[in-house]
Curated annotation (Swiss-Prot):
Protein name: Peroxisomal targeting signal receptor
Protein's organism: Eremothecium gossypii (strain ATCC 10895 / CBS 109.51 / FGSC 9923 / NRRL Y-1056) (Yeast)
Single Gene Ontology MF annotation: peroxisome matrix targeting signal-1 binding
Gene3D superfamilies cross-referenced by the UniProt entry: Tetratricopeptide repeat domain (1.25.40.10)
GO cellular component: cytosol; peroxisomal importomer complex; peroxisomal matrix; peroxisomal membrane
Assembly information from the UniProt record: Interacts (via WxxxF/Y and LVxEF motifs) with PEX14; promoting translocation through the PEX13-PEX14 docking complex.
Pfam families named in the record: TPR_16
Keywords: Cytoplasm, Isopeptide bond, Peroxisome, Protein transport, Repeat, Thioester bond, TPR repeat, Translocation, Transport, Ubl conjugation
Ranges: TPR repeats: 281-315, 316-349, 417-450, 452-484, 486-518
Biological process annotations from GO: protein import into peroxisome matrix, docking
């Protein structure tokens, strides 16, 4: 398997994903399921608690509480990110050992699969566990700027427990007399007026007008304001169209349409490299396989597979390998497009289903990821799937699929690393990183030389603020596959987490050098353009090094030779 975890920080893309969430009831696919603590705690439906009703009543009356805070998930931060709150969330014996014990007749007492079932039946407990997120400030601006996502995501985490506590406390406390409230407000108003000396309404208006004029001048002082705003707006609009095209998938077999969406639509088109030396080579697919086996650059292997699918658009294996290569090459969207084309031709391709599920998690399309994971299990172990996924509402989808994976894991005579992978992805999406780590380690016990699994383990460790352990996992992945661009990129981010900015820059420059293919120009809009994630992270590394002179050199298609005199890569 080769879908991998990665780190990216594209603010426009993140804003677009927030816009995408508002349309979940329309498409039911390619949306982020993490819309609040309730969703993460597997609540069975859009239920409203009494405290939330009370807060809504306060809001409608103009007395909304500000107790609820929303934080951007910052796995790159040096501060603790505690998603559990109790050690009970850990799988203490480990999945492999636990599975063996269960198969030998041992009860499930103390296992996290039993804990999961208990949490599903206890909304209050689950909500509390999720809402116990704590986050300290990062040690540098770089740490705050970059952030891990569930496998590639900066997901907003709703701290709703604080809001609930405030709401309950106010509801339970003695009612405040209206007259007393008005008196306190007037006293506070007088104190502010006295302190700021703005009691004169005419003077207040003059101050506001002056501030407004200064603000307008400041807005326009930086250059062509309208042009820059229009450019940003156009980028947001274009990315929204791109997500819509991916949401409205279809046009293939009935199974394919059922997995993606009930609406007839078209799969997003893959952007091919125009300068391709293998385009007229009839053995392009074989050449691509040889390049991968011999450790060639992933970008070069991608060119061979691109040529193969252009020669034969129905070549399932070529589309599959192209998707695998691009996800490893830190080109997620190109990988998703290729994998979707593979599934359009073969909806039951197990490797494509699992790989695209991880890529969907990376891009924030959790509902589609859960659907793909359910489809994978339904295809490989149909006897364990009791309820068709098309009859399950999206709020119960994650819980149901986790239960199905646990049922399979408990019943198998030996550990299936792919089942552990799927289970780990599900926990990863719900930010249960301790369980994710145990699942990935159980898979590595069976497949110790799986470089992609080592990379996924590293991403999970990094999200648990265990950067040193993550770095070891990434090094193991790179040792197994030196051309693994995504692992190098993740290694750079973890290096930045511990303050090793120079080393991070060298890892990023190495990754960029692997995107270069001899004799191939990197044309804008082609699939061979270096990852913007790598370029942006390199800029942050140079900023952390206080090297503004180097920052100015970081542009698309830059000549990497200018950095070789100072950096080893």
């Amino acid at each position: 398997m080769s879908a991998d975890c990665s780190v990216g920080a594209n603010p426009l893309a993140q804003l677009n994903k927030r816009v995408q969430q508002d349309r979940t009831l329309q498409h039911g696919s390619h949306v982020n399921i993490h819309q609040g603590a309730e969703a993460q705690a597997f609540k069975s439906g859009p239920q409203v608690s009494e405290s939330n009703k009370f807060q809504m009543e306060q809001f409608m009356a103009g007395k909304a509480s500000s107790g609820g805070n929303m934080f951007m998930g910052a796995g790159m931060s040096s501060g603790p990110l505690a998603l559990g709150g109790s050690s009970g969330l850990r799988m203490s014996p480990g999945p492999a050992k636990e599975l063996g014990a269960r198969l030998g007749g041992a009860p499930m007492t103390g296992s996290w699969s039993q804990e999961f079932n208990q949490q599903v039946g206890s909304p209050v407990q689950s909500s509390s566990a999720v809402s116990s997120v704590s986050m300290s400030s990062a040690s540098s601006s770089v740490a705050r700027a970059g952030a891990y996502r569930p496998m590639n995501m900066m997901r907003p985490v709703m701290g709703l427990q604080g809001a609930r506590a405030v709401g309950v406390e106010r509801h339970a406390g003695p009612a405040i007399n209206d007259a007393a409230w008005e008196q306190q407000f007037q006293e506070l108003e007088k104190q502010v007026e006295k302190t700021l000396n703005i009691s004169d309404p005419v003077e207040q208006q003059q101050v506001l007008e002056e501030l407004s004029a200064e603000a307008r001048e400041a807005d326009y002082a930086g250059g062509d304001y309208e042009k820059r705003f229009q450019q940003i707006w156009n980028d947001i609009h274009d990315q929204t169209d791109d997500l819509d095209s991916r949401t409205e998938l279809g046009g293939g077999s009935g199974d394919y349409q059922r997995v993606f969406s009930t609406r007839p639509a078209q799969t997003a088109q893959y952007a091919f490299e125009t300068d391709n030396q293998y385009l007229h080579n009839t053995d392009a697919y074989k050449i691509g396989c040889i390049l991968m086996e011999n450790g060639a650059k992933l970008s070069e292997a991608a060119l061979a597979f691109e040529a193969a699918v252009q020669q034969d658009p129905g070549h399932v294996d070529a589309w599959l390998r192209l998707g695998l290569v691009q996800t490893q090459n830190e080109k997620e969207l190109s990988g998703i497009n290729a994998l979707e084309q593979c599934l359009k031709a073969d909806p039951h391709n197990l490797m494509a289903l699992m790989t695209v599920a991880i890529s969907y998690i990376n891009e924030g399309y959790d509902v589609s990821a859960f659907t793909m994971l359910g489809r994978w299990l339904e295809t490989k172990y149909p006897a364990f799937v009791e309820e068709p996924l098309d009859r399950v509402d999206r709020y119960n989808l994650s819980r149901l699929i986790i239960e199905q994976y646990l049922r399979v894991a408990n019943a198998l005579p030996e550990v299936d690393p792919d089942v552990q992978l799927g289970l780990g992805i599900l926990f990863y999406a719900n930010e249960d990183f301790d369980k994710t780590i145990d699942c990935f380690r159980a898979a590595l016990a069976v497949r110790p030389d799986d470089e992609c699994m080592w990379n996924r383990l590293g991403a999970s460790l990094a999200n648990s603020n265990r950067s040193e352990e993550a770095i070891q996992a990434y090094h193991r992945a790179i040792q197994l596959k030196p051309t693994f661009v995504r692992a190098r990129y993740n290694l750079a981010v973890s290096s930045m987490n511990i303050g090793c900015y120079r080393e991070a820059a060298e890892h990023l420059l190495t990754a960029l050098s692997m995107h270069e293919v001899e004799g191939v120009a990197m044309a804008p809009g082609s699939g061979n353009v270096p990852s913007s994630n790598i370029l942006e992270t390199l800029k942050r590394a140079f900023i952390a090094m206080d090297r503004r002179d180097l920052l100015e050199r970081v542009v698309p298609n830059m000549d990497l030779q200018q950095f070789r005199g100072e950096f080893n890569f």
